[in-house]
């Protein structure tokens, strides 16, 4: 996307010319969308939607967030490895579809393990990711990561939490601070079985805390609550929470309702139960950690599915659905029509038309097989009823997630670690509003298109000028909170309709006047035509300091066809060289013999398997390339007919892990990097240690020829 300045020109009656700067528009990139091309559209897509083919994904994305630039960050496992470890961030650019250049991975982006953490955006534009941990790292569940979306870098230079926050929920409150709720010590999933012992051992965190960059984390000692965050029914486990129109925080923990005031030391109010307790066997209420919920309109929440307190509890799932209205002094609770399918560990998304799409889940606990639920269901607030939509191909249960993309489609990924499946894949659900019926078949609907905004940085109660590429009959202008989703709860989504007027191709809308309705952060702005078809969404900031970052971080570049040597940054005077076809590091300098100099010289070639990456051809053994083979690295003669050879001989340049030079990630084995160990060059999976960072960082220097 880009901006330019338009000049307003006026001629006065006597011929004088005045020129004034009227506005600096934010121009919207309406280039083709690869996610909308080449679709095999079924005949009923206009009524049931459709799913994409299953696409590969580099890791198990049990956490997903839409960044301000429109890219999607996922994390939860290492690359290609089905273990619990939140130290690898993957950045996917939807504008590139699913081709080989669409993903950019930050392995061990920081010395914090964000597995089963919580995340929200700060007013600075950075995403705060706090709590979590896994057995793979043993890192503290009191730690935080600050992810800068303008540079796609992460750091752990954030004050530590006061309490362990594994499985906590974090939201942004109206003044821009980050509020952490619930959570516990890692892996105390059975806390509900002996609440007294869990409390005695300080296993669960019953006091909220709040973060500001200037002060760090502060406990809200006046809001300690066993009712809201205690071990009973695992109420500490990812509480569902939202800022209410009153400015207080409303929450659902298992079957309990509560309200929190974050002023001063905080204060909490118990609002009672709205259903029976989860997992009692005689009924299947839509409560507990295994349920899902979304704010589909200001102060209105849809709570669906569940009936379990933990992923290991063998309980029948609920199909019940409840609307909770928190616009008054007391919540109003009423059941709406049940879903067709009972579900635990489903995901819910509010879409631009104001409906709610529920996907995934199981009819019993986290079972796949015959219990897996593949069809999506769509709930209409206008009718209070559900429509069964198209079927997915992959079971998405515990540790799966969904996210609304700017183009109005829904990304569905993850599931596993643990579970009956480990899903290194993703699917895209295309809701019915993206299609129209034509001659007995479904085709992509013509969509309104936003040409420009007066700014992508908006304040409260301000006018938003939206210009369309062509005039259209419009029904709505809406804002939807950019997603941050994990464990069946999207903590940042909310839906607001904006008042607007239309004159030709110009729409004048007004942003929310209250921070309570739309806390500071990032929102997708859509316009809907009279047929209910949305434009592509435009990401804007509201009450935030953010300005648009680049979509992709700068990739380190090498000069193709240059003669170079690879110099390990932590062994000055050493170069990578081949000896008897084995890649080693050795002391090589201008005074070394000619053979040593030639053995350490390589020609940079365009990657044999990926033009965005590189291959290294030996100078004195033409046709031989550095190639990985079962962790060993050496010279192998090129085999043009062997795709596996090309992948194993291709390395993608990354910023040096220790901050210096380059690191080289295998194209064939994502997450594995060239590293020297005991003077031998190897390909190893990044383990997060400072030594690995040093051993895998190289300077690229001119060859000594």
Map each language-model feature to its residues.
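Bacterial N-terminal signal peptides that target proteins for export
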Residues: 1-9
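Bacterial N-terminal signal peptides
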Residues: 8-18
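Sec/Tat signal peptide C-region and signal peptidase I cleavage site
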Residues: 19-23
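Kelch-like beta-propeller repeat domains
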Residues: 24-551
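Disulfide-stabilized cysteine-rich extracellular repeat microdomains
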Residues: 69, 124, 135, 166, ...
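Short loop/beta submotifs within extracellular cysteine-rich repeat domains
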Residues: 153-154, 187-188, 386, 410-411, ...
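Well-ordered beta-strand positions in beta-sheet-rich domains
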Residues: 497, 536-539, 599-601, 648-650, ...
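Extracellular glycan-recognition/adhesion modules and their associated mucin-like linkers
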Residues: 552-584, 601-632, 650-680, 696-705
């Amino acid at each position: 996307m880009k901006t330019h300045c338009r000049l307003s020109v006026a001629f006065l009656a006597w011929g004088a010319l005045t020129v004034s700067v009227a506005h600096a528009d934010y121009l919207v990139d309406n280039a083709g969308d690869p996610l909308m091309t080449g679709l095999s559209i079924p005949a009923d897509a206009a009524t049931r939607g459709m799913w994409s083919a299953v696409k590969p994904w580099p890791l198990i994305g049990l956490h997903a967030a839409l960044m301000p630039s429109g890219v999607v960050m996922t994390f939860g496992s290492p690359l290609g490895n089905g273990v619990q470890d939140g130290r690898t961030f993957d950045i996917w650019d939807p504008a590139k579809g699913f081709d080989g250049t669409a993903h950019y991975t930050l392995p061990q982006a920081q010395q914090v393990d964000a597995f089963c953490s919580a995340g929200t955006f700060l007013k600075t534009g950075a995403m705060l990711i706090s709590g979590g941990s896994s057995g793979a790292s043993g890192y503290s569940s009191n730690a935080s990561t600050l992810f800068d979306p303008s540079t796609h870098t992460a750091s752990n230079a954030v004050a530590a939490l006061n309490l362990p926050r594994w499985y906590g929920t974090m939201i942004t409150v109206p003044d821009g601070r980050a509020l952490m709720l619930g959570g516990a010590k890692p892996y105390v999933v059975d806390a509900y079985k002996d609440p007294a012992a869990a409390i005695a051992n300080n296993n669960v965190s019953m006091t909220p805390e709040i973060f500001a960059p200037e002060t760090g984390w502060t406990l809200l000692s006046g809001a300690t609550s066993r009712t809201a965050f205690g071990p009973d029914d695992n109420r500490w486990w990812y509480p569902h929470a939202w800022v209410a129109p009153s400015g207080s925080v409303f929450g659902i923990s298992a079957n309990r309702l509560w309200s929190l005031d974050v002023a001063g030391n905080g204060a909490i109010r118990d609002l009672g139960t709205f259903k029976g307790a989860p997992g009692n066997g005689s009924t299947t209420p839509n409560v507990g950690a295994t349920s899902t919920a979304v704010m589909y309109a200001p102060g209105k929440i849809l709570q669906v599915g569940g009936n379990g307190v933990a992923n290991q509890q063998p309980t029948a799932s609920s199909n019940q659905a409840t609307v909770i209205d928190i616009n008054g002094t007391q919540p109003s609770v009423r059941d709406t029509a049940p879903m067709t399918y009972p579900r635990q560990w489903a995901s819910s998304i509010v879409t631009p038309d104001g409906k709610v799409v529920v996907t995934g889940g199981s009819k019993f606990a986290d079972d796949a097989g015959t219990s897996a639920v593949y069809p999506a269901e769509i709930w209409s607030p206008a009718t209070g009823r559900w429509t069964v939509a198209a079927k997915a191909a992959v079971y998405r249960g515990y540790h799966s997630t969904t996210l609304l993309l700017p183009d109005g489609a829904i990304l569905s990924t993850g599931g596993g670690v643990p579970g009956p499946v480990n899903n290194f894949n993703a699917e895209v659900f295309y809701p019915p509003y993206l299609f129209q019926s034509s001659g007995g078949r479904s085709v992509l609907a013509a969509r309104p298109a936003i040409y420009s905004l007066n700014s992508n940085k908006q304040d409260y109660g301000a006018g938003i000028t939206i210009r369309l590429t062509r005039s259209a009959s419009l029904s709505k202008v809406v804002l939807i909170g950019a997603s941050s989703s994990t464990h069946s709860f999207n903590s940042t989504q909310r839906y607001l309709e904006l008042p607007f007027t239309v004159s030709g191709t110009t729409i004048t809308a007004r942003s929310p006047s209250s921070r309570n309705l739309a806390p500071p952060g990032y929102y997708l702005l859509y316009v809907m035509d009279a047929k209910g078809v949305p434009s592509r969404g435009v990401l804007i900031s509201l009450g935030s300091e953010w300005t648009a970052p680049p979509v992709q971080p700068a990739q380190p570049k090498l000069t193709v066809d240059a003669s170079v040597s690879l110099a390990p940054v932590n062994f000055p005077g050493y170069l990578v060289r081949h000896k008897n076809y084995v890649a080693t590091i050795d002391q090589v300098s201008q005074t070394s013999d000619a053979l040593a100099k030639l053995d350490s010289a390589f020609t940079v070639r365009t990657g044999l398997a990926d033009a965005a990456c590189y291959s290294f051809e030996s100078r004195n053994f033409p046709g031989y390339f550095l190639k990985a083979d079962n962790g060993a690295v050496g010279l192998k003669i090129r085999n043009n007919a062997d795709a596996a050879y090309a992948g194993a001989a291709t390395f993608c340049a990354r910023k040096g892990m220790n901050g210096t030079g380059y690191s080289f990630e295998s194209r064939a084995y994502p997450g594995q990097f060239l590293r020297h160990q005991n003077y031998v060059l190897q390909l190893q999976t990044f383990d997060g240690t400072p030594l690995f960072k040093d051993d895998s960082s190289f300077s690229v220097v001119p060859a000594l020829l």
